[in-house]
């Protein structure tokens, strides 16, 4: 039995999809365990580029299972659009499995997300407005509708009517706006559920069977540790737990099944949306990173905020997710910069701190303490080992590893699969 969890160590968009796809070649099952279609990842497969939001990266390997676990919130209509788009491009989706215990995103969740952001005004969280947060709220309130409920017409009808009554009063009282009606939702979403029924099963049993058969299971994380609702920059976080430990809850497997945790990061830092970002850049170096790195959100298209690498963040992520190995992406983006910087600690009210503050006010007063290293101008996109990298680029990666106390097992020097380099076997 062997399993690997891939998690983002920053604020998402670290390149987890690419690393998952890379590791998926040797896996038997690839499973998602948290988030929803707010997560976007770009995959290059067979010379083509695909942008996925809900579908696991393993979908491209027809002999492997691609699992959407119970911890994922599923918009049935959005998922069908994604599946149809893949089918139109000749990709079979017969290997998809969807948990019957996953929560369903409905139109009132999306509207609630939109209205909540409007209500917050300048204090908005910066959500993708996909209904993720409200769906998780309903789950916690025990009024959520699960995939198993969606497939049963009588159950779905009753639960939906009850929720529409409740949401109608809530929308009117909180926003002064109407809730989507039963008639606008029922037939469309029931039909969507029927189309998805062929994929629905008890995915926890699927994963357990894989472990019993000594198969290799790859868990695909969404977002990043710094967006975790418990361990991230609260309240500027997602509504779920992207940390590796959530595999046990969102995947439905025991903690003893996890063998390794791969922490994925960029050679710099990026963030979409609002919230603290101590190493954020607003100068020419920031412009260089954004444009060369094509830093625009897969889901939203919004320009990402960019900054220098923050080892305080990565050390926090290492502890929160039990990271055993590091994958550093987008090293090529820094090529051409005269100097590169790594944040080693923060200064808070005249004192040096090396731990990430929980208090938002403290965090806003933190000033990054940088270590400056010489940059490089040599082309790194063809490098296949650490030894082939320019001396300054190699020293930069080694310094990150030293500061974060995690060994580098993968490094990437470009967007293509053959630009991802494995330094040791992870399976």
Curated annotation (Swiss-Prot):
Q: Which residues bind IMP?
A: 13-16, 38-41, 128, 142, 223, 238, 302
Its name, as the record gives it, is: Adenylosuccinate synthetase
Q: What does this protein do?
A: Plays an important role in the de novo pathway of purine nucleotide biosynthesis. Catalyzes the first committed step in the biosynthesis of AMP from IMP.
Note whether GTP-binding occurs among the keywords.
Answer: yes
Which species does the entry assign this protein to? Staphylococcus saprophyticus subsp. saprophyticus (strain ATCC 15305 / DSM 20229 / NCIMB 8711 / NCTC 7292 / S-41)
Q: Which reaction does it catalyse?
A: IMP + L-aspartate + GTP = N(6)-(1,2-dicarboxyethyl)-AMP + GDP + phosphate + 2 H(+)
Q: Which UniProt keywords apply?
A: Cytoplasm, GTP-binding, Ligase, Magnesium, Metal-binding, Nucleotide-binding, Purine biosynthesis
**One annotated GO biological process:** 'de novo' AMP biosynthetic process
Where, by residue number, does Mg(2+) bind? 13, 40
Q: Which residues bind substrate?
A: 298-304
Subunit note = Homodimer.
Q: Bound how, and how many: what does the cofactor note say? A: Binds 1 Mg(2+) ion per subunit.
């Amino acid at each position: 039995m062997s399993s690997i969890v891939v998690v983002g160590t920053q604020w998402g968009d670290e390149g987890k999809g690419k690393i998952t796809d890379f590791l998926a070649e040797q896996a038997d099952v690839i499973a998602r365990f948290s988030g929803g279609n707010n997560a976007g990842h770009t995959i290059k497969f067979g010379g083509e580029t695909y942008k996925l939001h809900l579908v696991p990266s393993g979908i491209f390997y027809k002999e492997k299972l691609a699992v959407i676990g119970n911890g994922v919130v599923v918009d049935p209509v959005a998922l069908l659009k994604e599946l149809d788009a893949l089918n139109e491009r000749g990709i079979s989706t017969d290997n998809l499995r969807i948990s019957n215990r996953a929560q369903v995103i409905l139109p009132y969740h999306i509207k609630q997300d939109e209205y909540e952001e409007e209500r917050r005004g300048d204090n908005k969280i910066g959500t993708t407005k996909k209904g993720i947060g409200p769906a998780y709220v309903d789950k916690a309130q025990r009024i959520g509708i699960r995939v198993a409920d969606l497939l049963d017409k009588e159950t779905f009808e009753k639960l939906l009517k009850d929720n529409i009554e409740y949401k109608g009063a809530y929308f009117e009282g909180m926003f002064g706006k109407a809730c989507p009606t039963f008639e606008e939702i029922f037939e469309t979403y029931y039909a969507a559920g029927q189309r998805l029924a062929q994929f629905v099963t008890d995915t926890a049993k699927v994963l357990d069977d894989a472990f019993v058969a000594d198969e290799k299971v790859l868990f695909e994380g969404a977002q990043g540790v710094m967006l975790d609702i418990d361990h991230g920059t609260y309240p500027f976080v997602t509504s779920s737990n992207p940390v590796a430990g959530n595999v046990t809850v969102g995947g439905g497997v025991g903690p003893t099944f996890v063998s390794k945790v791969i922490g994925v990061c960029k050679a710099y830092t990026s963030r979409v949306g609002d919230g603290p970002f101590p190493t954020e850049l607003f100068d020419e170096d920031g412009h260089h990173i954004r444009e060369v790195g094509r830093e625009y959100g897969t889901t939203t298209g919004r320009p990402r905020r960019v900054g220098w690498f923050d080892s305080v963040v990565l050390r926090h992520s290492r502890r929160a997710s039990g990271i055993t190995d590091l994958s550093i992406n987008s090293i090529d983006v820094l090529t051409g910069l005269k100097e590169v910087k790594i944040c080693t600690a923060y200064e808070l009210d005249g004192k040096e701190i090396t731990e990430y503050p929980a208090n938002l006010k403290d965090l806003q007063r933190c000033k990054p303490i940088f270590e400056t290293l010489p940059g490089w101008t040599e082309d790194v996109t063809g490098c296949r080992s650490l030894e082939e990298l320019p001396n300054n680029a190699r020293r930069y990666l080694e310094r990150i590893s030293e500061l974060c106390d995690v060994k580098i097992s993968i490094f990437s020097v470009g967007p293509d699969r053959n630009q991802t380099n494995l330094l040791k076997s992870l399976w």
